[in-house]
Design a protein with these regions (language model features):
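Extended, low-polarity segments enriched in aliphatic/aromatic residues
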Residues: 21-308
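Bacterial N-terminal signal peptides
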Residues: 7-17
């Protein structure tokens, strides 16, 4: 009878095991019902005090997620809409100005809205990062038990695209925290412009992981991204380029890396996605997803599940 080493048996066992790719759910139905269907398929029930993280959109921008689209879901989870002030001037750089934008864009009509850095900031530890040791976020972040991340997927002038990873990194950071991310930890005040692009993208991934880690290692957070109004510019732009491609749908996952990867893949598959592809590639946008996977935030492999 042949004898086998423990190492050989371990190799056989590993070879027989299979990686369970995270599910990414998809619907073409960009409506309150479609949004609710994706939420239901995720199978995770928010508990405790629930934050709904989204972008309130710069004054002059009309591409942000509309209250008419998201209102039913926000009420379903009994959520408080949360945002932070910006670090680049504009209409959302100070709380009073930001509150006016929130009112003008209709968010007060569907839920309470919390500007999380209104009373200061707190630090979240970053583990396994190349650039960041901490992620500085709005102090009210600590008041929430669960986060539902509602993202409008679109292009971005600096990141190439804005997806779920950007929404929980730059989006949850205080103005000082935003500078830290944009400059890859080299400074915490002044201009956000930085010439080491990959370092900035990697810092976004590291900040996103800090947020996920703080929420039960990703157990108290879920992600839904809406692919409509697909401009090359972000909702933080008050004068964005008009979209020149068709709306695609709504996607959801418990894995933000898989979700962003799936959104990017759908842009590449679209027959009219050339402008957004050019924007993403010119900024090396996929590198945020690459680094997020490298540091263990999630998987670039996924199981695409249509719910239509």
């Amino acid at each position: 009878m042949k004898k086998f080493s423990l190492a050989f048996l371990l190799v056989l066992a590993l070879a027989g095991s299979s990686f369970a790719a995270p599910a990414v759910y998809f619907t073409k139905d960009i409506s309150p019902a479609g949004l609710m269907a994706i939420y239901e398929h995720l199978g995770r029930t928010p508990e405790g005090k629930v934050a709904v993280k989204l972008s309130t959109g710069e004054a002059g921008n009309t591409h942000y997620l509309s209250p008419a689209l998201i209102g039913e879901l926000v009420k379903r989870v009994n959520g408080t809409i949360v945002e932070c002030n910006t670090a680049y001037g504009g209409s959302r750089s100070a709380t009073a100005l930001h509150r006016q934008v929130i009112e003008d864009h209709g968010f007060n009509a569907i839920a309470n809205v919390d500007i999380m850095d209104e009373e200061g900031e707190v630090s979240l530890p970053v583990t396994g990062g190349k650039h960041l040791k901490e992620d500085v976020v709005g102090s009210h972040f600590k008041n929430y038990d669960f986060v539902l991340v509602l993202t409008h997927f679109k292009g971005h002038a600096m990141g190439g695209f804005g997806g779920a990873l950007k929404n929980i990194s730059i989006g949850i950071a205080s103005p000082r925290g935003k500078v830290i991310i944009h400059t890859a930890g080299t400074k915490d005040s002044g201009s956000i412009w930085y010439d080491k692009q990959d370092d900035f993208l990697e810092s976004m991934a590291e900040a996103a992981k800090a947020v996920s880690d703080s929420l039960g290692g990703g157990k108290r957070i879920m992600y839904i991204s809406v692919m409509n109004h697909l401009s090359v510019d972000c909702d933080c732009d008050g004068n964005p380029s008009a979209p020149d491609m068709h709306d695609i749908g709504i996607l959801g996952s418990l894995d933000p890396v898989a979700l962003d990867q799936a959104c990017v893949d759908l842009v590449y598959k679209a027959p009219d996605g050339s402008s957004l592809i050019k924007r993403m590639e010119s900024r090396h946008g996929i590198h945020t997803v690459e680094h997020a996977a490298e540091i263990g935030l999630g998987s670039r492999e996924y199981d695409f599940v249509s719910v239509d």
